Curated annotation (Swiss-Prot):
It holds the Pfam family THF_DHG_CYH. It comes from Thermus thermophilus (strain ATCC 27634 / DSM 579 / HB8). This is Bifunctional protein FolD. Catalyzes the oxidation of 5,10-methylenetetrahydrofolate to 5,10-methenyltetrahydrofolate and then the hydrolysis of 5,10-methenyltetrahydrofolate to 10-formyltetrahydrofolate. It comes from the Bacteria. Gene3D superfamilies: Leucine Dehydrogenase, chain A, domain 1 (3.40.50.10860), NAD(P)-binding Rossmann-like Domain (3.40.50.720). InterPro entries: Aminoacid_DH-like_N_sf, NAD(P)-bd_dom_sf, THF_DH/CycHdrlase, THF_DH/CycHdrlase_cat_dom, THF_DH/CycHdrlase_CS, THF_DH/CycHdrlase_NAD-bd_dom. NCBIfam families: PRK14173.1 (NF010770). It catalyses: (6R)-5,10-methylene-5,6,7,8-tetrahydrofolate + NADP(+) = (6R)-5,10-methenyltetrahydrofolate + NADPH; (6R)-5,10-methenyltetrahydrofolate + H2O = (6R)-10-formyltetrahydrofolate + H(+). SUPFAM superfamilies: Aminoacid dehydrogenase-like, N-terminal domain, NAD(P)-binding Rossmann-fold domains. GO terms for molecular function: methenyltetrahydrofolate cyclohydrolase activity; methylenetetrahydrofolate dehydrogenase (NADP+) activity.
Length: 282
């Protein structure tokens, strides 16, 4: 039997319905400011998608575009101005940044309460300490996608392949909050296929097309493919399609985690607006 398809579009629409319901009870409109440097085609497309979705929800969204050679100090000055602007709830600087700009310095410059990407060290610390904060959108999207399809993570053996600061590490923290038993595997993990075969839930986020084959996957596992790799004009995941022969459920690429990342960004923007005004989400 073919694996169940875990559609990110369906789960994302449920998130948007919740956001719309919450917005109806508010006396203000959340505001999102996105900064993009240069004209990298992927960045242009991602920013356009985020702005379009924000506007569709009724947010006040604005994209600021600067030349790729914008000095780092000029970018930091603009972020400082947006931090001080009471009309702005969320700030997002589209990554990757040009080589002359220190990404970590930029991420640390964004006020933690306006950090809708969830990358500020204070928010990272809150994630791991069990506190309230704004957390990275893709890991949030993975957890929300699993919950949408009724996956109870408590006590589950979950293996995350990939230890990036954007996906793997924060996802491990979020899964621990759900009482999962988490293994964080990576390129130096010995006998990676043996480790992945233990997983009841397997999440792969390494950026290597079709790395995971069906022999790597436990019969009846739930598999989440975070990878998006462009190969000869096609988008391929990190998981080979043959995994559908053994998995119970599998996210597609595209159409799986991607839509959830944007949905959780919209959720973070609302949370930022509420946290900044009331200190708690409503």
């Amino acid at each position: 039997m073919a694996a169940q398809v875990l559609s990110g579009h369906e789960a994302a629409e449920a998130v948007y319905e919740e956001i719309r319901a919450r917005l109806r009870s508010l006396s203000f409109t959340p505001s999102l400011r996105v900064i993009r440097l240069g004209e990298d085609p992927a960045s242009v497309a991602y920013v356009r998608l985020k702005d379009k979705r924000a506007r569709a929800l009724g947010y006040r969204s604005q994209v600021e575009v600067y030349p790729e050679d914008l000095p780092e100090e000029a970018l930091l000055e603009r972020i400082a101005a947006l931090n001080a602007d009471e009309e702005v709830d969320g700030i997002l600087v589209q990554l990757p940044l040009p080589p002359h700009i220190r990404t970590q310095r930029v991420l640390e410059a964004i006020h933690p309460l306006k950090d809708v990407d969830g990358f500020h060290p204070l928010n990272v610390g809150r994630l791991w300490s069990g506190g309230k904060g704004l957390f990275p959108c893709t890991p949030l999207g993975v957890v929300r996608l699993l919950k949408h399809y009724g996956v109870d993570l408590r006590g589950k053996e979950v293996v995350v392949v990939g230890r990036s600061n954007i996906v793997g590490k924060p996802l491990a923290g979020l899964l621990l909050r759900e009482d999962a038993t988490v293994t964080l595997a990576h390129s130096k993990t010995q006998d990676l296929p043996e480790v992945t075969r233990r997983a009841q839930v397997l999440v792969v986020a390494v950026g290597r097309p079709h790395l995971v084959r069906k022999e790597w996957v436990r019969e009846g596992a739930i598999v989440v493919d975070v990878g998006v790799n462009r190969v000869e004009g096609r988008l391929l995941g990190d998981v080979h399609p043959e995994v559908a022969e053994v998995a119970f459920a599998l996210t597609p690429v595209p159409g799986g985690v991607g839509p959830m990342t944007v949905a959780m960004l919209m959720g973070n923007t609302l949370e930022a607006a509420l946290l900044r005004r009331h200190g708690a989400s409503g």
